[in-house]
Amino acid sequence: MEFLQTSRRRNIFGDLMHIALNLALVCMVFAVMYVGQRAEIALILIMLSKWRVFAVRWRYWRVNILANLVDFTVGFGVVALLYLAAGSGSSHTLWLQVGVSIFFALWLVVIKPRTRALASKVQAGTALFIGSWALAAFSHDIGQIATVIFYLGMGYGAARHVLVAADDKHYSLLASVFALVLAELGWVTYHWNIGYGLSLLGGFMLPQMAIITLCVGVIAERLYQTIIAKASFSQPRISVPVIACTVVVLVLVLFVSSTGPGLYPNQTII
């Protein structure tokens, strides 16, 4: 009994230390971006926080990197959003960066540690949303080829994350198919870049493609569940999300869109 109590105390202490270190990372990233807008230092901090990925023999790096693509996507995406908030020209820059930092803290402490199947879907969806937001915002800074490649990696990582949690034997093939679909969205993002925002937030806008990418991910996951579980599409848990996401995409593309090159070239300001 005494051993169990000691072990429990150690586990609690370890959990508290893990939370404290994650919150320290959030504070350091926020400070670096708010004070000096040094995105490269913030990215280095994100990489250093993933030291365990590389703390093995080099031949295991590929597996570890693929297994952590979702976490890398969110981390790099948060840095991009902090940078976007800093250059938004809004009088609420501080609060925008605080909001992004609070989200990052929730990701590290609450969302990321979960291991259930539903949690893996939430994690993958978060990566798709944050990653596509960042890529849409900076697509014309990094170029068309880089945008497509990053979309490809983001799609593979998100799909792999869900499929591995579901113990699918063909996860690599299926993840590659989804990655190709997202690569196409990456190409579209470069040429069709529209943002929605509030006038008081300045250039800090929500890209249309972030919403569309998330909807595509939800549709793909629900259709995958239909095939795997041999369920009928008429079941509400399958049909409702698919129909809702399809309607959202159609409304955005047909009624709230206009095309043109550039960073949020046709901005919808509320």
Language-model segments: residues:
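Membrane-helix boundary elements
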Residues: 20-23, 69-83, 135-137, 156-171, ...
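Membrane-proximal helix-loop-helix units in multi-pass membrane proteins
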Residues: 90-103, 107-184, 188
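Short alpha-helical packing/oligomerization segments
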Residues: 192-215
